């Protein structure tokens, strides 16, 4: 996202007709609010150049000089809610002279996510568009600690890496807490020190609907009874503000309100949607305990695919 934003700014300075495209609406809204810093005029201007991905299906060919798509792995296929086109990847390619896709295949988390590297390349070739690949070597959100990211991927059995036994501990801080209360105290301490810090969880608990009395995080859905712990998911109203509003720092974020954002510290609660099977020595997703209704569509009898998405969420 840092690279994407720098490219975006340079293109704006060069006078190009460019838009910053963010498929995740929470990520886009948080970016606009942070950059506008409570200034209405600035927010109105930013809203014109920061966009979701649903509108380009009706754009005339080559309407834009450049479209920069951050978190492009979350671009959607036909049939997605409120999207009337056939392929958001193809929409972007057709609508712009140059399209830049920032992609991480291992952050695809739903069956209708279509923005994989292979798919983008295939659609580009279909539309006679030249493809230039650039590999970004380090994770900014992990202080450049590639070893830690590789260890997480190996531990979750996403892929085998050379970091199966750990990473350089000086490069990245990682702790396992005994209770959710201990985790919460640690994150709160970091917040008091001026760090950006939040708690997130896997989608292993239901999210009470607005019509059932939960428009603004009134219901404590995330419960761990054995520890007497209960906290609300992020508010359904202005969901993205959970990440930037200190009055909502007690709320628990989910993948859909946190993906793409960076924090100094993050606490992760693992739920029953993921488990280790000692008989097969495998880490798997659990369909019954995974509560993202859209994320599990068509996956009841596809345990490997379900597990891949759930492990990507925790990654």
Predicted regions and their residues:
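Conserved coupling/interface region of RecA-like P-loop/ASCE motor cores
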Residues: 103-184, 188-192
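A short beta-strand-to-loop transition that corresponds to the Sensor-1 phosphate-sensing loop
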Residues: 25, 71, 96-98, 103-116, ...
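Accessory C-terminal helicase-associated subdomains
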Residues: 161, 165-258
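Conserved RecA-like ASCE ATPase "motif II neighborhood" in helicase/translocase motors
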Residues: 37-95, 250-253
């Amino acid at each position: 996202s840092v690279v994407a934003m720098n490219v975006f700014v340079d293109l704006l300075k060069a006078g190009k007709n460019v838009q910053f495209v963010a498929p995740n609406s929470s990520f886009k809204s948080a970016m606009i609010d942070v950059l506008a810093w409570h200034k209405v005029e600035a927010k109105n201007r930013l809203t014109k150049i920061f966009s979701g991905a649903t509108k380009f299906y009706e754009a005339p060919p080559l309407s834009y000089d450049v479209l920069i798509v951050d978190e492009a792995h979350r671009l959607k296929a036909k049939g997605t809610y409120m999207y009337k086109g056939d392929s958001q990847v193809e929409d972007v390619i057709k609508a712009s002279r140059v399209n830049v896709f920032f992609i991480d295949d291992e952050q695809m988390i739903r069956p209708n996510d279509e923005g994989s590297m292979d798919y983008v390349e295939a659609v580009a070739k279909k539309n006679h568009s030249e493809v230039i690949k650039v590999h970004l070597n380090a994770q900014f959100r992990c202080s450049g600690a590639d070893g830690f990211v590789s260890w997480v991927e190996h531990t979750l059995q996403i892929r085998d890496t050379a970091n199966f036994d750990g990473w350089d501990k000086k490069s990245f801080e990682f702790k396992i807490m005994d209770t959710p209360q201990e985790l919460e105290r640690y994150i709160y301490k970091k917040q008091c020190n001026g760090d950006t810090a939040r708690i997130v969880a896997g989608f292993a608990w239901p999210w009470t609907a607005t019509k059932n009395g939960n428009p603004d995080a009134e219901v404590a859905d995330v419960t761990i009874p054995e520890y007497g712990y209960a906290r609300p998911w992020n508010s359904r109203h202005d969901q993205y503000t959970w990440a930037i509003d200190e009055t909502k720092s007690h709320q628990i974020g989910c993948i859909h309100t946190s993906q793409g954002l960076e924090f100094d510290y993050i606490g992760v609660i693992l739920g029953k949607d993921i488990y280790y099977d000692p008989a097969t020595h495998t880490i798997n997703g659990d369909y019954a305990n995974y509560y993202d209704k859209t994320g599990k569509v068509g996956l009841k009898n596809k345990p490997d695919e379900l597990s891949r998405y759930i492990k990507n969420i925790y990654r």
